Amino acid sequence: MRIRLVTVGKVKEKYLQDGVQEYLKRLRPYARVEIVTVPDEPIPDGASPAQEAQVMQREGERLLRALDQGGQEHVVVLDGRGKNFSSEELAAFLAERALHGDANLAFVIGGSLGLDPAVLARAGTTLSLGRMTFLHQMVPLILLEQIYRAFKINRGEKYHK
């Protein structure tokens, strides 16, 4: 299985970078996982809704260019309006994708303002991490941990409780 996290902006905090690297290492026996980062767009102070929409559009264009243009990836966008999966449901989702030959996944994480409608339209699946709001830079770490947990669940290995 090949999994890509396609995200806007780099993780800047060292403790989060360390966590991301740890889970990338833990995932190596289960899947090829990579993180593709596109630059974030500066948000002007006191940005108007139109300026915010323009920021999301520019970031969205970058995200779409980073996705597999051949349609070989199942695109999963993270959005607060998406489906809430339990860890077991995420494990079942990954297993189902692999079973049906859809083993290339791209999880798309938008910028701090969210995702442009064009990116949302590209989604095969829309996933929510829940109703809480997370620091944007934490999302890759949280997602990687959940993907790791899902692989452990699917293999019946000790980790998930």
UniProtKB/Swiss-Prot annotation:
Domain of life: Bacteria
GO molecular function, one term: rRNA (pseudouridine-N3-)-methyltransferase activity
EC code(s) of this entry: 2.1.1.177
Signal sequence interval, chain numbering: none
One Pfam family of this chain: SPOUT_MTase
The reaction(s) this protein catalyses: pseudouridine(1915) in 23S rRNA + S-adenosyl-L-methionine = N(3)-methylpseudouridine(1915) in 23S rRNA + S-adenosyl-L-homocysteine + H(+)
Annotated keywords: Cytoplasm, Methyltransferase, rRNA processing, S-adenosyl-L-methionine, Transferase
Localization per Swiss-Prot or TrEMBL: Cytoplasm
Binding positions (S-adenosyl-L-methionine): 78, 110, 129-134
InterPro entries (alphabetical): Alpha/beta_knot_MTases (IPR029028), RlmH-like (IPR003742), tRNA_m1G_MTases_N (IPR029026)
Chief subcellular location: cytoplasm
A Gene Ontology term for the protein's cellular component: cytoplasm
SUPFAM superfamilies: alpha/beta knot
NCBIfam families registered for this protein in UniProt: PRK00103.1-3
Family: Belongs to the RNA methyltransferase RlmH family.
Task performed by this protein: Specifically methylates the pseudouridine at position 1915 (m3Psi1915) in 23S rRNA.
Subunit composition and interactions: Homodimer.
The protein, known as: Ribosomal RNA large subunit methyltransferase H
Source organism of this protein record: Symbiobacterium thermophilum (strain DSM 24528 / JCM 14929 / IAM 14863 / T)
